[in-house]
Curated annotation (Swiss-Prot):
Membrane-spanning ranges: 54-71
Family annotation (PANTHER family): PROTEIN KISH-A (PTHR13229)
Membrane topology: Single-pass type I membrane protein
A single BP term in Gene Ontology: protein secretion
Organism placement in taxonomy: Eukaryota, Metazoa, Chordata, Craniata, Vertebrata
Any GO CC annotation of this UniProt entry: Golgi membrane
Keyword Membrane on entry: yes
Role: Involved in the early part of the secretory pathway.
Cytoplasmic side: 72
Name used for this protein in its record: Protein kish-A
Sites carrying sugar chains: N35
Short name of any one Pfam family annotated for the protein: DUF1242
Segments on the Extracellular face: 27-53
Amino acid sequence: MSAIFNFQSLLIVILLLICTCAYLRSLVPNLLDKNKTGVLGIFWKCARIGERKSPYVAVCCVVMAFSILFMQ
């Protein structure tokens, strides 16, 4: 099933996008900082969410991992 129609898969994709963008911005800041607007600005916004809300994102990742491992 597509990640668009399955809510849990959609949450996984969003969490992975946030974590990946935050990690890439920590390695190469100029890569995401030059695209703050437009369609590519989504990646910059995801990186900002990952940096500023990192404890909440980490908790969500752990909860999602446990739900995938033990609930399915």
